[in-house]
């Protein structure tokens, strides 16, 4: 089991990063709520990971804190929720916000998450509500709002929009939906990470 990695960030392409560890490069997918907290390119990062082995691939999912990883591990145990949907859910809501939605049985907000319909939202409520009681509650104390990492300003608005649309598609949105979300909030001074963050928040 690979549970923690420490290395230099070589590439950032939401929701992916390329992490260099002693000359070896590792592709890691992160939920956007964690991606926002990454340091700049060329800087060192510590990533808490969940390793998934499939017949056709070995995949690493990364998180800023063990609390996100713990929540992801519980999410993918839910019937019909795989790693891709688990990543999308934690991109649309932080772990704390997700727990709050479960405790309040807030289906209306859950169904706004990419890939989550009414049946999936109801299943999440039934299967997750008891599971979160078994998690260490100290992991889920309120934390400060996630901060966006600054990025180079030489990216054009169009390339930022294209990158944001690509990231939303990776998180489960249909291409037309992703394009419309970005179109609705696009501004020349917004980088790709800001566009993604605003787009996800606009669905809640």
Curated annotation (Swiss-Prot):
GO terms for molecular function: ATP binding; four-way junction DNA binding; four-way junction helicase activity. Residues 144-155 are annotated as: Flexible linker. SUPFAM superfamilies: DNA helicase RuvA subunit, C-terminal domain (SSF46929), Nucleic acid-binding proteins (SSF50249), RuvA domain 2-like (SSF47781). One of its GO terms (biological process) is DNA recombination. The keyword Cytoplasm applies. Residues 156-204 are annotated as: Domain III. InterPro entries: DNA_helicase_Holl-junc_RuvA_I, Hlx-hairpin-Hlx_DNA-bd_motif, NA-bd_OB-fold, RuvA, RuvA_2-like, RuvA_C, RuvA_C_sf. The keyword rRNA-binding does not apply. NCBIfam families: ruvA. Belongs to the RuvA family. This is Holliday junction branch migration complex subunit RuvA. It comes from Hamiltonella defensa subsp. Acyrthosiphon pisum (strain 5AT). The lineage of its organism: Bacteria, Pseudomonadati, Pseudomonadota, Gammaproteobacteria, Enterobacterales.
């Amino acid at each position: 089991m690979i549970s923690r990695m420490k290395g230099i960030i070589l590439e950032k392409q939401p929701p992916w990063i390329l992490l260099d560890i002693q000359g070896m490069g590792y592709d890691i997918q992160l939920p956007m709520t964690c991606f926002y907290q990454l340091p700049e390119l060329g800087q060192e990062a510590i990533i808490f990971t969940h390793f998934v082995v499939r017949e056709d691939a070995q995949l690493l999912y990364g998180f800023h804190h063990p609390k996100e990883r713990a929540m992801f591990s519980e999410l993918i145990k839910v019937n019909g929720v795989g790693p891709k949907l688990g990543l999308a859910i934690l991109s649309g809501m932080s772990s704390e916000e997700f727990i709050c939605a479960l405790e309040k049985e807030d289906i209306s907000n859950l169904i706004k998450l990419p890939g989550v319909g009414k049946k999936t939202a109801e299943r999440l409520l039934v299967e997750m509500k008891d599971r979160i009681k078994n998690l260490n509650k100290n992991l889920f104390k309120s934390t400060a709002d996630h901060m966006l990492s600054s990025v180079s300003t030489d990216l054009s608005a169009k390339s930022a929009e294209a990158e944001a649309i690509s990231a939303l598609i990776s998180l489960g949105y249909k291409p037309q939906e992703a394009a419309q979300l970005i179109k609705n909030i696009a501004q020349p001074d917004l980088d790709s990470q800001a566009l993604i963050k605003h787009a996800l928040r606009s669905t809640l």
